[in-house]
A protein has these predicted regions:
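Hydrophobic faces of well-ordered beta-strands that scaffold small-molecule active sites
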Residues: 2-6, 71-74, 90-95, 126-132
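Acidic/polar active-site rim loop that often engages polyanionic ligands
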Residues: 7-19
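Short, solvent-exposed loop/turn segments at secondary-structure junctions
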Residues: 11, 52, 78-79, 99-100, ...
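An alpha-helical appendage that flanks or caps ligand/catalytic pockets
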Residues: 23-62, 102-195
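A local structural motif
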Residues: 66-70
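A conserved active-site cap/scaffold subdomain adjacent to cofactor or substrate pockets
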Residues: 77-108
Length: 195
């Protein structure tokens, strides 16, 4: 048994593979379709897509869950990802990642609004998630004191990227870029995550 997390990746990952970030959505959707077919279609079969070509696809053993394992979509707030996850053909769990609580609430409300207003159904609580760093200490103060240097290193060193590498031109639609900046104000800071 498993829960699958399907992520599009970030702009820098496409650059490192010599690919345009502007095609990240179509590559992601095609890869999703390939994985779903591999999980649900009797093999072997050939897959011929625009970006992926396989003469022989045959997953064995097949997943235990039917029709396939649950899929969660981690995201930083791309409107296209929210709409794709909420689509009635999917109804995948939307997982907001590394965001302050107020931004999480806004993006999860957006998922509910899209499900209701665009697709005509009420999103269930099980379709909404928040991936937040958690550290447990003897007291809240001790936990913050012990965790802060590690979280600061994670956000300020390991995830430190210039905007053009993190969100290069074409990676987000203009409406998603404006939405992320409006609700998150750029990259999350450690202090805003402590609440």
């Amino acid at each position: 048994r498993l829960i699958s997390g399907m992520v599009r990746g970030i702009g820098a990952e496409y650059y490192s593979m010599g690919m345009s970030p502007a095609i990240s959505h179509e590559r992601f959707h095609e890869a999703h379709d390939l994985v779903i077919q591999a999980w649900t279609k009797e093999g072997p079969f050939a897959f011929e897509g625009k970006h992926y070509h396989f003469e022989y696809v045959n997953v064995w053993p097949r997943p235990f869950q039917n029709p396939h394992p649950p899929i969660w979509c981690p995201s930083q707030g791309s409107l296209e990802t929210i709409e794709w996850a909420a689509d009635p053909d999917h109804k995948y769990t939307y997982l907001q990642t590394y965001s302050p609580f107020e931004a999480v609430k806004k993006f999860l409300h957006m998922y509910r609004d899209v499900a209701r207003d665009k697709f005509g159904y009420e999103a269930q609580d099980s379709q909404l998630g928040w991936a937040a760093p958690i550290y447990i200490g003897e007291t809240d103060e001790k936990a913050i004191e012990e965790a802060r240097p590690h979280m600061e290193a994670f956000f300020n060193k390991f995830l430190r990227m210039t905007p053009e590498m993190l969100l290069p031109p074409g990676y987000l639609s203009l409406r998603s870029y404006k939405n992320v900046m409006k609700h998150k104000g750029g990259l999350s800071k450690v202090r805003s995550m402590e609440d």
